[in-house]
C-alpha cells in the first residue's frame, strides 16, 4: 500500500472514531436553557467535577440591559454536561453599604476549587469596587462548606503588595522609580515606553499597593499546589502567584 493510501486510511479511521463523540456533543446550538427553561446566566466562570457531578459557576448578569451589572455568582449542576439545574446565587452582591461586594460592584471570572486540606470550597474572582469603574483591579476570595454555597466573602485586594517576583533584581527598582518621572514615558506605545514596560515600570508603580488583577483563572498542578494566573500591569502582562495551602 502506498504512503498516500495509508495516510488516507488513517484519516478516515480517525474521523469515524470521532463520530460517536460528535453525536454526543453537550450543546446542539441555540439558547442553552436550564431546568426552569431560562437562559443559563453564568458568564466567564468555570466547570469542575466533584463526586461525579459537574458544577458550573459564573457571573450572574442582570437582565435590565445595563452593561457590567452584576448580581453575584450563580451555580448550575449537571450529570451529563447537557442538562443543567439552576441553584441560584451562591455568592450574591451585598446590601451592606461600604462592603467590597456592595451592589453596583463588578464581579467577573469566578473560579471555584476544592481544598483537600481545609475541606472548603474556595472561590476566586476579579472584583471592581462600586463606583470606580475598572480602577480597583482587585482579586476577591470567598469560601463555603458545600459546593452549593452560600459562599462567605473573605476579602479583596491587590496581589503581592511589597513582594518582589522571583528573579527580579532589587537594584533595578531604583532606576524604574526614576523612569516613572520621565514625561516622555507618559505617552503609551512609544519604543521607549515599551522598553520600560518590559522591564517592569508599571510593576514598580504598583509595588507598594500590590499588583493589578483583572481577567484571571486558578490552576492546580499535579502536586496539589494552586496558582492564581491573572492579567496585570494595565492588562499588558500575565502574572502568576502561588497560593498558600489554605
Q: What positions do the PLM features span?
A:
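Bacterial Sec-dependent N-terminal signal peptides
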Residues: 1-25
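Carbohydrate-active catalytic/glycan-binding domains of CAZyme proteins
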Residues: 22-246
Amino acid at each position: 500500500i502506498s504512503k498516500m493510501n495509508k495516510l488516507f486510511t488513517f484519516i478516515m479511521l480517525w474521523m469515524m472514531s470521532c463520530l460517536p463523540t460528535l453525536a454526543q456533543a453537550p450543546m446542539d446550538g441555540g439558547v442553552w436553557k436550564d431546568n426552569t427553561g431560562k437562559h443559563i446566566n453564568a458568564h466567564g466562570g468555570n466547570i469542575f467535577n466533584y463526586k461525579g457531578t459537574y458544577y458550573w459557576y459564573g457571573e450572574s448578569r442582570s437582565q435590565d440591559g445595563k452593561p457590567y451589572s452584576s448580581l453575584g455568582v450563580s451555580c448550575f449542576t449537571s450529570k451529563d454536561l447537557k442538562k443543567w439545574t439552576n441553584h441560584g446565587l451562591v455568592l450574591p452582591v451585598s446590601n451592606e453599604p461600604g462592603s467590597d461586594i456592595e451592589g453596583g460592584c463588578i464581579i467577573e471570572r469566578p473560579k471555584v476549587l476544592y481544598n483537600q486540606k481545609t475541606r472548603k470550597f474556595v472561590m476566586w474572582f476579579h472584583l471592581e469596587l462600586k463606583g470606580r469603574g475598572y480602577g480597583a483591579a482587585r482579586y476577591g476570595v470567598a469560601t463555603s462548606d458545600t459546593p452549593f454555597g452560600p459562599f462567605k466573602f473573605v476579602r479583596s485586594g491587590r496581589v503581592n503588595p511589597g513582594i518582589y517576583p522571583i528573579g527580579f533584581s532589587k537594584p533595578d527598582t531604583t532606576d524604574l522609580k526614576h523612569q516613572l518621572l520621565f514625561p516622555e514615558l507618559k505617552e503609551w506605545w512609544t519604543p521607549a515606553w515599551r522598553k520600560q514596560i518590559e522591564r517592569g515600570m508599571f510593576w514598580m508603580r504598583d509595588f507598594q499597593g500590590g499588583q493589578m488583577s483583572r481577567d484571571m483563572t486558578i490552576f492546580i498542578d499535579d502536586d496539589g499546589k494552586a496558582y492564581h494566573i491573572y492579567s496585570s500591569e494595565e492588562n499588558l502582562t500575565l502574572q502568576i502567584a502561588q497560593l498558600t495551602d489554605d
